[in-house]
């Protein structure tokens, strides 16, 4: 059980099922392979689209289903061949494990020569990185210990594929950080306590609430045609879009159903059809954010696209220092004044980039049909509601207000979670990276509902597949872990979070003013 003080009252990580060993047992893995082939065949081409459509700068989806599909089925020849015949298998050739130090592994951090560490074992993924179903997000952990990010985002069947790239064992000069050990023990404890299991009735209730919101919005303009009614209906539609955004987020993190392909199906319905954004585009962007929140490279070029907002917004003085244009500096001097207004255009930006994603020539015909077809259904129902029920220019007013309202409601919650927190260009372990870059907003009936559970953003980043209704249960244990290891657990009111975001923007704006004067 979980102790009140946030520690472990019994058991440890060693007492749990070893998923790595389980996944490599022939009987179990064969069963999982057959099951995955039967239930999830449809999503493989979409999974591999994520990999092909990423660049070295912008990494891709590290979603659980992508890893599961790559292990469970082998219809893609280049993947199966590379897994079957990896270049390096030193442990087989030498008949005994080779040992490596952290320094040895760190020297192999290039796309053509890349090693990673997972559970004290070293893997040479040089021949696999380009074919990684999750895309180039794997690049962010070249030469590093990827134990926690791998365990957090991958299905148990993904352990099987690792065995083909095993080249030896890690020998540490120093022991693993106690922080990481205790984080792993907490994760094992939460697994035993069934906290990764979702309440289907909870999600049914959330769905019904959303249906009632959209039904009310449509009913208002069905009965009344005044501009007051149009504005009220549009505002409710914006709220509906925001709340459906949280639902799609839950499904696409595989929080709801135990079967990953079913989460994906519902995620596509809510994401593409209801909301009109490309799920593939979103995963490409969002899962990299989870792997490298607020992280930049050595030159302070953002790795996390969520902070790649120049030339309009600069989230730190280090990012500001990369700006050379005097015109940009003049704009940035006022970023704290126009920022909240800018949030209203967030959804329009996401719709634009989603549409642009579907035009990429790398997409196969099937991928184009899936993305464009489901997104087209969104525009059909959304425009039909507006133009069928409203006369004159009122449909345009209704749609514009809906988009602006939903953009603000979504964007406002997002910026509270990470903006105004540390932006860094140094290597951090998984746990330190999540906590340093993330802020919680205090729990409460309204906050929990309005933010879709993302007010517990620290907990979500540490355990992204945990259903939102369990995040408040684990927050005392996460806070205890942070305090024990001297980490700042930022848990503030919504007003305080807003103030901290705006203060950061103002501080950077002042620095932009000084920088512009110095350049004159």
Swiss-Prot record:
Keywords from the named record: Fatty acid biosynthesis, Fatty acid metabolism, Heme, Iron, Lipid biosynthesis, Lipid metabolism, Membrane, Metal-binding, Oxidoreductase, Transmembrane, Transmembrane helix
Glycoprotein keyword on record: no
Gene3D superfamilies per UniProt: Cytochrome b5-like heme/steroid binding domain
Positions bound to heme: 132, 154
CDD domains on file: Delta6-FADS-like
MF GO annotations: metal ion binding; oxidoreductase activity, acting on paired donors, with oxidation of a pair of donors resulting in the reduction of molecular oxygen to two molecules of water
PANTHER family in the record: DELTA(5) FATTY ACID DESATURASE FAT-4, FATTY ACID DESATURASE 2
Protein name: Acyl-lipid (9-3)-desaturase
The species this protein was found in: Ceratodon purpureus (Fire moss)
């Amino acid at each position: 059980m979980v102790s009140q003080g946030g520690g472990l009252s019994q058991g440890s990580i060693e007492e749990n099922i070893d998923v790595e060993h389980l996944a490599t047992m022939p009987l179990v893995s064969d069963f999982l392979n057959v099951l995955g082939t039967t239930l999830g065949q449809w999503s493989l081409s979409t999974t591999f689209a994520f990999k092909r459509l990423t660049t070295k700068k912008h990494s891709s989806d590290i979603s659980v289903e992508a890893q599961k599909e790559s292990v469970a089925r082998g219809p893609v020849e280049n993947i199966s061949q590379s897994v079957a015949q990896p270049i390096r298998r030193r442990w087989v050739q030498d008949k005994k494990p080779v040992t490596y130090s952290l320094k040895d592994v760190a020297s192999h951090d290039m796309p053509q020569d890349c090693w990673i560490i997972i559970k004290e074992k070293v893997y040479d993924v040089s021949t696999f990185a380009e074919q990684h179903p999750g895309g180039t997000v794997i690049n962010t952990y070249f030469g590093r210990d990827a134990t926690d990010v791998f365990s957090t985002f991958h299905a148990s069947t993904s352990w099987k594929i690792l065995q083909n790239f095993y080249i030896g064992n890690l020998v540490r000069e120093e022991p693993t950080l106690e922080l990481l050990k205790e984080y792993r023990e907490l994760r094992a404890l939460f697994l035993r306590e069934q906290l990764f299991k979702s309440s289907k009735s909870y999600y049914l209730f959330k769905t019904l609430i959303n249906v009632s919101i959209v039904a009310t919005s449509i009913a208002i303009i069905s009965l009344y045609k005044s501009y007051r009614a149009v504005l009220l209906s549009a505002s409710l539609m914006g709220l509906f879009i925001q709340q459906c955004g949280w639902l799609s987020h839950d499904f696409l993190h595989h929080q709801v159903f135990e079967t990953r392909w079913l989460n994906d199906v519902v995620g596509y319905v809510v994401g593409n059809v209801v909301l009109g954004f490309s799920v593939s585009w979103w995963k490409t962007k969002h899962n990299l954010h989870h792997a490298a929140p607020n992280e930049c490279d050595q030159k302070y070029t953002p790795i996390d696209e969520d902070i790649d907002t120049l030339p309009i917004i600069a989230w730190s003085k280090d990012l500001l220092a990369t700006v050379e244009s005097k015109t940009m500096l003049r704009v940035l001097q006022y970023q704290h004044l126009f920022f909240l207004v800018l949030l209203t255009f967030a959804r329009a930006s996401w719709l634009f980039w989603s549409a642009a994603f579907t035009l990429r020539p790398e997409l196969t015909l099937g991928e184009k049909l899936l993305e464009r077809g489901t997104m087209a259904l969104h525009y059909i129902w959304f425009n039909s509601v507006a133009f069928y029920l409203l006369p004159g220019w009122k449909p345009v007013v209704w749609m514009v207000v809906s988009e602006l309202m939903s953009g603000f409601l979504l964007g406002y919650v997002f910026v509270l979670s990470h903006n105004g927190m540390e932006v860094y260009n140094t290597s951090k372990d998984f746990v330190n990276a999540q906590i340093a870059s993330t802020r919680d907003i205090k729990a409460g009936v309204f906050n929990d509902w309005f933010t879709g559970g993302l007010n517990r953003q620290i907990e979500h980043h540490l355990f992204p597949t945990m259903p939102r209704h369990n995040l408040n249960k684990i927050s005392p244990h996460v806070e205890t872990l942070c305090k024990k290891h001297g980490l700042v657990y930022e848990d503030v009111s919504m007003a305080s979070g807003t103030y901290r975001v705006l203060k950061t923007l103002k501080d950077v704006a002042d620095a932009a003013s000084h920088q512009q004067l110095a350049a004159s």
